[in-house]
Amino acid sequence: MALEKSLVLLPLFVLMLLVLGWVQPSLGKESRAKKFQRQHMDSDSSPSSNSTYCNQMMRRRNMTQGRCKPVNTFVHEPLVDVQNVCFQEKVTCKNGQANCYKSNSSMHITDCRLTNGSRYPNCAYRTSPKERHIIVACEGSPYVPVHFDASVEDST
């Protein structure tokens, strides 16, 4: 009797392990929208002329693990304002795709660029606070930013 129960439960147990094996990796995978937020959003602070801002933020946001990300931009505006860019002026992305949008107004940003001679694991960045229009690629449902394409000066 106990052996029969074991034989019935064993295939169910194996099936459960297989399902968990397929589901678990997808649970831990960061969506493109979440990655955009991690890499580019810093709504809680204003542009900083503090020379260590980029060094701290690039480390804190995991962009110096395994390599030094050469360039990154942080946006210091409310997330909803950046998400609204997806419904503003449509422009062509740098890679030729047609899903990029330019903000109607300039936004507070901080550009971070790897300094010359900086090598992993000692990633050092130059911090440049700016006010620029941003260009983001958008996708999904809801339609949200998934890639920071560029920043451009006001053309007026």
From Swiss-Prot:
One GO molecular-function entry: lyase activity
Location(s) in or outside the cell: Secreted
Positions bearing carbohydrate: 50, 62, 104, 116
S-S bonds: 54-112, 68-123, 86-138, 93-100
This protein's record includes keyword Amino-acid biosynthesis: no
Cleaved signal peptide residues: 1-28
Catalytic site: 40, 147
Record Pfam families: RnaseA
InterPro entries cross-referenced by the UniProt entry: RNaseA, RNaseA-like_dom_sf, RNaseA_AS, RNaseA_domain
Name of the protein: Ribonuclease pancreatic
Organism taxonomic ancestry: Eukaryota, Metazoa, Chordata, Craniata, Vertebrata
Gene field: RNASE1
